[in-house]
Design a protein with these regions (language model features):
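A short, surface-exposed helix-loop junction/capping segment
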Residues: 137-145, 327-332, 382
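Glycine- and charge-rich intrinsically disordered segments
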Residues: 1-8, 12-14, 280-283, 290, ...
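Conserved aromatic-histidine-acidic binding/catalytic patches
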Residues: 58, 80, 96, 128-129, ...
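Extended, regular secondary-structure scaffolds
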Residues: 158-265
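Short amphipathic alpha-helical segments
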Residues: 136, 140, 148-157, 164, ...
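C-terminal helix-loop subdomains that flank or include functional centers
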Residues: 320-326, 341, 348, 352-499
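Extended, charged amphipathic alpha-helical segments
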Residues: 5-6, 240-379, 420-422
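Extended, helix-rich architectural segments
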Residues: 1-182, 496
Length: 499
């Protein structure tokens, strides 16, 4: 706590290997043992005891495992030798297994897509925090929203959410290209990058790092603090003999031009983290059920007795003759085992998966109504999705806020350089604007917009709120409305006299 931020950063720069230290992802525990010896003891309601420091052990889950869990063609059930097989006797009296294809189900991908849609399905909501904005401020606000939409920043954030929910973390870099245009770039584990963030004891970011390997096998570290971009490599060392940089060399240290680290990072659980075991159970039961259905699904013809191998066919029917002495031969069709219990068990697992992951799988067969469905019915049906998305809005707010701050700062530099607004840096710095996610759910746009009109007519919301909340406004809608009011307020020209 006593060390200053710069002292800690300098220590990282002197020992680059420390930048590679990363807290692992975990899931569950390998033991049931409780380290707190007082657990389960009796005590008085007003008693006190010395606090026990946390020592909870967790099981590490690698990001490579996340990647395999996301890919249905890499699931464990495909390599499970405990799935039963069908054994038959061949013509030569030997036995062999019938080839049976195992099935990996893409639950993880479905959960990922539904959670990403629930959080990112709507455009970001922008709010200008100024009770009486000037015309210049309105113009700058409209310009910011237009450039945000034109450069597809919503889509970039959606991809960032999808990557974090797939592999555990993601990095979004805001930078200025050679033409002085503000651009964005995504770093993900799937593309060969490790995202590592170092913070001080108060949780304030110190260094945001990207660790990767190039095509020649040389490892690199790109580290960003509030001022500089540091590039390290473990290639040909240029360090002196007295340098203790752990084999890493500082290639460059450049001023990145932003007021804070331009790398926006987010870390968290993958979308299916709480239900992975249930998904594996569902896959095992499903594959066992498929084997049973393939072997016995169409029933069995059971023949008892000594049957003459030469069968007769009369009027399209095959006649089997029992040649046994006691004449107790019989033929009957054995019905296949009823699948109802297995199907009910699979459905119960599916219900637990939906509850555990916080999203709902609704298929067309589940919709029984042929008319319009009320908004309340939709909310009740998709309550799991709405609750998860509402929680995700809070969890992702810092990510969106930093992304907006960096984009606004970069856009101001771009507008100054291309001459569109020479005062953009000062004006954009004074513009107090925020952005946030708005959870998505199916709804009737006409009814929603009509509700906004009704609220505006009743004086319960302002015109500005209606512009921001409705689904058809353009980014510069306030400017358009202001221009329209100005034109309507202009006095009409005097009519020309014919006299």
């Amino acid at each position: 706590m006593s060390r200053t931020r710069q002292t800690i950063i300098n220590d990282f720069l002197k020992h680059p290997r420390k930048m590679l230290l990363k807290r692992p992802f975990t899931r569950g525990s390998d033991e049931i043992f409780i380290n707190d010896s007082s657990d389960g003891e009796s005590t008085l309601s007003n008693a006190v005891r010395e606090a026990c420091l946390p020592a909870v052990k967790r099981r590490i889950v690698s990001q490579e495992r996340f990647a395999k869990e996301l890919d249905p063609n890499s699931h464990k059930v495909l390599f499970d030798d405990n799935i039963p097989s069908i054994c038959v006797m061949t013509n030569d009296g030997t036995y062999r297994d019938i080839e049976f294809k195992k099935y990996g189900l893409n639950f993880q991908m479905c959960i990922l897509k539904k959670k990403t849609l629930a959080l990112c399905g709507n455009k970001r909501v922008f709010i200008l925090h100024d009770s009486n904005p000037s015309e210049a401020l309105k113009k700058n606000f409209a310009s910011l929203k237009w450039h945000w939409e034109e450069s597809n920043q919503d889509g970039i954030e959606t991809r960032a959410v999808s990557i974090q929910q797939s592999y555990g973390d993601v990095g979004l870099l805001i930078y200025m290209n050679e033409r002085h245009e503000v651009k964005s770039r995504i770093f993900s584990y799937a593309d060969g990058y490790q995202i590592i963030t170092h913070k001080d004891d108060n949780g304030e970011p110190l260094l945001d790092c990207v660790y990767y390997r190039d095509g020649d096998g040389v490892r690199h570290i790109d580290a960003y603090d509030d001022r500089f971009h540091y590039h390290f490599t473990d290639g040909v060392s240029v360090a002196s003999e007295n340098d203790d940089s752990d084999g890493w060399s500082l290639v460059s240290a450049e001023y990145h031009g932003f007021s804070e680290s331009p790398l926006v990072t987010k870390r968290g659980d993958v979308a299916w983290n709480n239900v992975q075991d249930l998904i594996e159970l569902f896959e095992i039961v499903y594959n066992v059920f498929a084997v049973i259905q393939k072997r016995h699904g169409w029933g069995i013809l059971y023949i008892k007795g000594k049957i003459n191998e030469t069968a007769k066919k009369i009027a399209g029917s095959i006649i089997l003759n029992d040649t046994s002495i006691d004449g107790k031969g019989a033929v009957e069709f054995k019905s296949p085992p009823s699948p109802e219990n297995m199907l009910e068990f699979l459905q119960s697992i599916l219900d637990l998966i939906q509850i555990g992951c916080g999203c709902t799988f609704i298929l067309p067969k589940d919709v029984k109504s042929s008319g319009d469905i009320s908004g309340l019915a939709i909310q009740m049906t998709r309550s799991l999705d709405i609750e998860s998305a509402a929680d995700a809005v809070i969890e992702w707010q810092n990510f969106v806020s930093k992304h907006l701050r960096l984009f606004k700062e970069g856009l101001a530099k771009q507008l100054v350089y291309n001459g569109d607004n020479p005062n953009a840096i000062t004006e954009f710095e004074q513009m107090r604007v925020s952005a946030s996610f708005k959870p998505w759910q199916p709804f009737d746009e006409f009814t929603y917009n009509q509700m906004l009109c009704t609220l505006k007519s009743a004086g319960l919301i302002s015109t500005k709120t209606g512009i921001e909340k409705n689904t058809v406004s353009t980014p510069d809608e306030e400017m358009r409305l202001s221009d329209e009011l100005s034109v309507n307020a202009m006095p009409l020209d005097e009519p020309i006299s014919n006299e």
